[in-house]
Curated annotation (Swiss-Prot):
Swiss-Prot/TrEMBL keywords: Eye lens protein
Tissue-specificity statement: Eye lens.
Protein name: Delta-1 crystallin
GO molecular function: structural constituent of eye lens
Protein purpose: Delta crystallin, the principal crystallin in embryonic lens, is found only in birds and reptiles.
Length: 466
């Protein structure tokens, strides 16, 4: 373990820290991913120190050169961590001193690890959100373009997992695409707050050296700077927001996964997953398990747990910095990794999914058109409640006769209502059924086509903002 002389804060204390305490305190394994962004922030801060006359130009050049060397070592995987490195910030500081000597100590002038940690995390999440957004938009695009290609496929729509009305397969796909566009918008909103720069806030009271925070903002390509130093070092709203957005996104992906799991069962047989996203059974050779979709569904629970955990961490801490905040990185970075993987798998599943059109058509049984029978009577002038009752009587009559509703004779229907005429035969067509829903957002072909065009335009805008 590290000696007292090695410790960053060792001058205040006598004796050594319990080794178990050092293990509990260390976050180096999680924080190694912050290496590059910490180097970027350190380079920017060094330039600000030079502008404030704390560093000479020669010292600045040495520090920048040393940081570039560390960046190179990190990218090659040869940056060595030692037992004295409590976190990535101390590891970089230690390595910089090894490379350029005591001048390295000047880099921390006026800068605390409190602001370093939150700055590094914001910089990493800024780029992470861009990656997640790219994958999310690709998934939405895959859903939309598949909907455009398969617009003529009609299937049963369900409520309570019971057959309800005929809909277009494309209407189903677009329902998920639309939900995901809201997630994309929310990611953009979170990014606005992540790109507010806390660097220059010091340990809690601000920076005493007239550091140019606008220079820091410009160097790090952030949108604005934090307003209050105490709030800047302690706020983790952006972590909660990102995980909250991820939670909603995972709810939507879990719903998509569950729908497709159901549709892929032999009882439904509407879709077949690609072998690339399925597994077999060690004992049951006939089975094709939708593991990819089941994992997407289960990963939602993992993300929900991370949200609950970070909320519990934050709810009891006082203002400024507490060691509790060390838990933020593991939580949010795990969520980032989960989303990145899940979105790519979901896109792969959708892009390779086989549609079993014949099975969908077989499932379009005549009782699905019972509502259309009621609408027929409404168009003849009957109030909707009476029309629904009449339709229900027709269903009951068909059941009594042991036939399907479309096999009732005109005389049978007239016994229920004199408004039924020979044109009632047009009701018993699934194409006619879906085509009556022409209002915006409906399942008629014209409406679905309009949805596709609107989503394509929305994707263009969101891609520009990602």
């Amino acid at each position: 373990m590290a000696t007292e002389g090695d410790k960053l804060l060792g001058g205040r204390f006598v004796g050594s820290v319990d080794p178990i305490m050092e293990i509990l305190s260390s976050s180096i394994s999680t924080e190694q991913r912050l290496t590059e962004v910490d180097i970027q922030a350190s380079m920017a801060y060094a330039k600000a120190l030079e502008k404030a006359s704390i560093l000479t130009k020669t010292e600045l050049e040495k520090i920048l050169s040393g940081l570039e060397k560390i960046s190179e070592e990190s990218s090659k995987g040869v940056l060595v961590m030692t037992q004295s490195d409590e976190d990535i910030q101390t590891a970089i500081e230690r390595r910089l001193k090894e490379l350029i000597g005591d001048i390295a100590g000047k880099l921390q002038t006026g800068r605390s690890r409190n602001e370093q940690v939150v700055t590094d995390l914001k910089l990493l999440l800024k780029s992470s959100i861009s990656v997640i957004s790219t994958h999310l938009l690709q998934l939405i695009k895959t859903l939309v373009e598949r909907a455009a290609i398969e617009i003529d496929i009609i299937m049963p729509g369900y409520t309570h997992l019971q057959k309800a009305l005929p809909i277009r397969w494309s209407q189903f796909l677009l329902s998920h695409a639309v939900a995901l566009t809201r997630d994309s918008e929310r990611l953009g909103e979170v990014k606005k707050r992540i790109t507010v720069l806390p660097l220059g806030s010091g340990v809690l009271a601000g920076n005493p050296l007239e550091i140019d925070r606008e220079l820091l903002r410009s160097e790090l390509d952030m949108t604005s700077i934090t307003l209050n130093s105490i709030d800047a070092i302690s706020e983790r709203d952006f972590v909660v927001e990102l995980i909250s957005v991820a939670t909603l996104l995972m709810i939507h992906l879990s719903k998509l996964a569950e729908d497709l799991i159901i549709f892929s069962t032999t009882e439904f047989g509407f879709v077949t997953l690609s072998d690339a996203y399925s597994t077999g059974s060690s004992l049951l050779p006939q089975k094709k398990n939708p593991d990819s979709l089941e994992l997407i569904r289960s990963k939602a629970g993992r993300v929900f747990g991370r949200l609950a955990a970070i909320l519990m961490v934050l709810k009891g801490i006082p203002s400024t910095f507490s060691k509790d905040l060390q838990e933020d990185k593991e939580a949010v970075l795990d969520v980032v990794d989960t989303l990145t993987a899940v979105l790519q798998v979901a896109t792969g599943v959708i892009s390779t999914l086989q549609i079993n059109k014949e099975n969908m058509e077989k499932a379009l049984t005549p009782e699905l058109l019972s509502t259309d029978l009621a609408l027929y009577l409404v168009r003849k002038g009957m109030p909707i409640r009476q029309a629904q009752t009449a339709s229900g009587k027709a269903v009951h009559l068909a059941e009594t006769k042991g036939i399907t509703i479309n096999n009732l004779t005109l005389e049978d229907l007239k016994s229920i209502s004199p408004l039924f005429a020979s044109d009632v035969s047009q009701v018993f067509s699934v194409v006619n059924s879906v085509e009556q829903y022409t209002a915006v957002g409906g399942t008629a072909k014209s409406s679905v086509t309009a949805q596709i065009e609107q989503l394509r335009e929305l994707l263009k805008k969101q891609k520009e903002q990602a």
